[in-house]
Amino acid sequence: MVSLELALHFCMNAGRFSTMDDQQKQPLALLGNTGLLNLPKTAFLSSRKVSPEAVLRCCAWAAAQRDAGRCVISGFHSALERDVLRLLLKGVQPVVLVLARRLYSPQTLEREHADLKRALDDGRLLLVSTSSAGRANASSTIQRNRFIVDQADEIVVGSLSPAGSLAPLIARADESGKRITRLDSNPDSSRTL
């Protein structure tokens, strides 16, 4: 477990986005096991629209990550991402949940997110807030997704809409040499970008 002093140092210094304009940089807010940031992490991102076949592949992938104990980082915001989170929380592997809004209050965690509270208490969850906004918006969502991609060692894409906000981010990650796996492709032509 990382010390509180180191976590605060991360928030004040290293926790600023290197990929954004100065006006968009904000310190991070962290709750949970900050040591998870030191683990190899696989990002899971998905557009809202997804085929039933891709949903099945994503659920199988999530179960495999859970069973292997791999750390997954995501915003877990789209319906598919929330399904993946539910599967992951049934295991004991580490999870980093990145919010595009301010952190949940302790009362909200207790009342509405008992599964997250249990994972926090077990030391296998880190909540990261990349925005102080009360609700996620288009700008804070892009900011969150950039943070996820920057923190990840590899990226798994459940579904990618060519016109969506994820497409340019995934293209940029591909250009930077990150390993990207698409689960929404035909299994016979499934490829790693």
Q: What is each of the regions a protein language model found here?
A:
Residues 10-12, 16-193:
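Glycine-biased, small-residue-rich flexible motifs in mid-sequence functional cores and linkers
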Residues 2-7, 14:
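Acidic, Ala/Val/Gly-enriched low-complexity intrinsically disordered segments
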